[in-house]
């Protein structure tokens, strides 16, 4: 499975939100079977979270967006604003969307939601900026 836009956003929409609203989002990622090789080809060193990334059963990337669909399209196309993890991992699906009133609110919520997910899903590596 991979990210399919805008269809993957539709289950999270309601009467008060549109695809272009600000939000915090969580993407399920899949690591390549040769993660170390792929990583070493793209980057000069491995991050301090390397062991967590490798040992976790699942990987989730949490991000904030001023315009949700635009940011997800950036992730999907990888033409602009690449992230480290999506440069080496494939996006499997959009796991969740938390709508926010604006980008400032989304940035504040991103950290809180990341920590909540880390605490709630011990077998998952949760990455945010």
Name what the model sees in each region.
Residues 1-66, 70-73, 104-112:
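GIY-YIG nuclease catalytic motif and its immediate N-terminal context
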Residues 74-78:
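Residue-level signal for well-ordered alpha-helical positions
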Residues 16, 85-86:
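Short secondary-structure boundary/capping segments
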Residues 86-92:
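Charge-biased low-complexity segments
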Residues 117-129:
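Coupling/hinge elements of helicase-like and P-loop NTPase modules
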Residues 59-62, 92-102:
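A short, exposed loop/beta-hairpin motif centered on an aromatic-Gly-Thr core
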């Amino acid at each position: 499975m991979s990210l399919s836009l805008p269809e993957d956003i539709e289950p999270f929409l309601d009467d008060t939100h549109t695809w272009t609203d600000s939000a915090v989002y969580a993407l399920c990622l899949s690591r390549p079977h040769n993660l170390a090789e792929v990583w070493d080809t793209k980057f000069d060193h491995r991050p301090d979270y390397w062991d967590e990334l490798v040992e976790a059963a699942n990987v989730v990337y949490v991000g904030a967006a001023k315009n949700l669909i635009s940011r997800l399209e950036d992730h999907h196309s990888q033409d602009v604003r690449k992230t480290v993890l999506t440069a080496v991992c494939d996006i499997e699906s959009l796991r969740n969307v938390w709508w926010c009133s604006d980008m400032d609110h989304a940035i504040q919520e991103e950290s809180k939601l990341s920590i909540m997910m880390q605490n709630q899903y011990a077998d998952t590596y949760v990455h945010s900026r």
